[in-house]
Amino acid sequence: MSRAMDITRIPGSAIGAVVAGADFSGTIDDTQVEEIWQALDQHLVLVFRGHKDPSNDDLLMFARRFGHVPKTGLTTGASPDHNEILLISNILDENGQKIGVGNAEWMDWHTDYSFRPRVSRIGFLAAVELPPSGGGQTLFTDMYTAYESLPDDLRQRLHSYRARHSLRSGYEDVIEEEYQGEVSIEGPTAKPFVAPEDGTATVHQLIARNPRTGRRAVYANPLNTKRILELDVTSSKEVLQQLFAKPGEPELTYAHEWLPGDIVMWDQLGTVHAKRAFDPTERRLLRKVVTIFDDPAEPWHPEDAA
């Protein structure tokens, strides 16, 4: 039987809780899984501390209790023996090649896999090596409350909009005809523009719905959301800029100061995250795993706003 956990809200923070006593050995039971789900539903970001550092196998086994873990598909930047694990690092190997992805600079607000048909449901980051002088904090913003705080008329309109997400820059300027008839996940003859685990661009509704809680979130981020299809270019930019002003608002945001051994788990559907810069002469390494929705349509519901 898994040992008891202690879950404590992070004082003074808009979101987030610290979880002590979690079992990463692969023996986590169904009761503890549901307890973690409920804590995630409430706090959106969970910081696990006071546990034995899990092996790659144990980390993956733990993550799989919360959904399907896809391979990264990368030939560089992933763990050599576990392609599902992305290495977030500025470290160079003996040949001067990066061992992972990322750098020491600011990483803009985003949510993982928004540019793929099967978006990420949960993210996990495990600290391995941290810059001694600090920096590199990971920031999380609550996009459920961001949605709920919008003016009623705007919130209603957002439910009729779809947005294009892309890993490629400049793609928002493609002619309108190319947008039409691209990604569709409806109907027996639907043909996705990209494969579920191999894509770099797709289209999603602008409002997502958490299948466990029913809460709705703005599903847009400055890094990957390029265009609202139903609006002209100017109007699309105006609406997106209004939405992009939400990430980082203090009353919606938690800034995680990393400690050795920390594992952070977060709701990818209802949050966006970013990374602060750190000294590029110092080393930083984290292991990253995500889960994705089994059904690509699960987070997207056409019903009107409540």
Curated annotation (Swiss-Prot):
Fe cation binds at residues 110, 112, 273. It is an enzyme of class 1 (oxidoreductase). Disruption phenotype: Accumulation of pentalenolactone D. Its cofactor is Fe(2+). It comes from the Bacteria. Binds 1 Fe(2+) ion per subunit. GO terms for molecular function: 2-oxoglutarate-dependent dioxygenase activity; ferrous iron binding; L-ascorbic acid binding. Pathway: Antibiotic biosynthesis; neopentalenolactone biosynthesis. 2-oxoglutarate binds at residues 138, 258, 284. InterPro entries: PentlctneF_syn, TauD-like_sf, TauD/TfdA-like, TfdA_dioxygenase. Keywords: Antibiotic biosynthesis, Dioxygenase, Iron, Metal-binding, Oxidoreductase, Vitamin C. GO terms for biological process: antibiotic biosynthetic process; lactone biosynthetic process. Its EC number is 1.14.11.36, 1.14.11.-. It catalyses: pentalenolactone D + 2 2-oxoglutarate + 2 O2 = pentalenolactone F + 2 succinate + 2 CO2 + H2O. The keyword Metal-binding applies. Activated by ascorbate. SUPFAM superfamilies: Clavaminate synthase-like (SSF51197). Catalyzes the Fe(2+) and alpha-ketoglutarate-dependent oxidation of pentalenolactone D to pentalenolactone F. Also able to catalyze the oxidation of pentalenolactone D to pentalenolactone E. In presence of neopentalenolactone D, mediates production of PL308 and possibly neopentalenolactone E. Belongs to the TfdA dioxygenase family. S.avermitilis does not produce pentalenolactone itself in vivo but instead a group of new metabolites that are neopentalenolactone derivatives. This is Pentalenolactone F synthase. It comes from Streptomyces avermitilis (strain ATCC 31267 / DSM 46492 / JCM 5070 / NBRC 14893 / NCIMB 12804 / NRRL 8165 / MA-4680). The gene is ptlD.
